[in-house]
Amino acid sequence: MEKFEIPLPTGGIISGRLSFPTTPRMPINLPLIVCIPGGSYDAEYFDVDEDYSISSSSAWAGIPTIALTRPGYGSSTPAPIDDTDQNITYGQVQGKFLNSTILPALWQEFGSRTGATAIVLLSHSIGAMISTIVAGSYTGCEGYPLAGLITSGIGTELAEGPQKAMLHLLEEATGSIQFEITPKDAIMLQVPMQNLTDQKMCRHTNHLNRPVPPGELHDINTSWLGYWRTYSDRITIPVMHGLSEFDGLWTCSPKILEEYKAAFPASPKVTSEMILQAPHCIELSLQSKAWYMKCCAFALECVRWHVLLSESAPMSVRPGSGERGTEEGLSQKGITTLVYSTTKVEEAGL
C-alpha cells in the first residue's frame, strides 16, 4: 500500500496507507473500504507485508482501500477536544472528529478518484468502538455516503484478567503507554500458547507496537460498555461483526454473539459470528486472508444495498388497493411495511 497524508479543513493532517486498483475488475458499484485500527497500532496493522495486507484481497476484488493512522498516532493530528463538555469520552471525541471532518475529507479527496459509490468502515478493537460511534452519529448530511460497518476484536463482556492489567497500567501511567511486546503478543496473538499465527509475524510485532494514548484505554475498559448502546441503537446500515474464538481481551460465546447482534435493532442486516481458531488480532493471524475476503464480499453487498435503496423511493399504500395492507394498519399489528416504486415489499419487525 502507498503512504499518504492529506490536509484537513480544520487544520492538521490525516495520514495512512491506500491501495487503489488501476482498473476495476467489472463495471459495478464499488465500496471505498476505510480501515480503522485498534489501540497500539497505526495504518501498518492492515498492511504488514504482502501476505498480511488487506490490499492482497481488496486488489483482487477491485476494491479501493484506505487504512488510517488514527488521530493522535504518528503524523495524524490529534482530535480537537471540546473543553466545555466534561462528560465526553475519548472515543466520542475521535468518533465525532472522524464523522464530521476526516471521512468527509477522505471522500472529497478520493471518492471520485476511485470511482467508489460509498464508504464501508472496517474496524478493529478500539477502532471498532470509534467506528460504532461514527455510524451511530451519522446522519447523511456530513458530506460522505456511509453504506456499511465491519467490527472485530470487540464484544459485550471484557475478559476480567486483561481488564485488570490494563487498569493497573493506567494507574501508573504519566503519559502514553508503551506495551511490553512479550505479554502483548500473548494477549493479542496467543503466542506461544496457541498455534494461531505464522511464526514470522512475531518478527513484525515489535515495530508494529505504537504508544497508546491513555484516554482510549480508559474509555474501552471503564466506560464503553455503559454507553455503547446509545450509538448501536441508532445504526441504520448493515453490520458485520467477528469475535475470535481465542480473543484475549473479550469473552467469546454464543450468548455474547447474540447480545452483540441484538444491539443493532435499526440495522437492516446484522451478522455476528465466532472466528474459529483466531486470536484477538484476526488480521495478524492465520485467519487473516479468510477474514479480509469476507470483509470485501460484505462491503460489495453493502454498496449494492445502498444503491438499490437510494433508487427506490418509498410511497404510501392506499387502503383497499389490494396490496398486503396499509402502512398504518400493519404498524398497529407490529409490522412495518414499506412499498417501493418497484412494487417490492420490504417487511421488518416481524
Task: Indicate residue ranges for each PLM-predicted region.
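Conserved hydrolase catalytic core segment
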Residues: 125-151, 157
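Alpha/beta-hydrolase
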Residues: 160-253
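Catalytic histidine-centered segment of alpha/beta-hydrolase-like enzymes
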Residues: 278-287
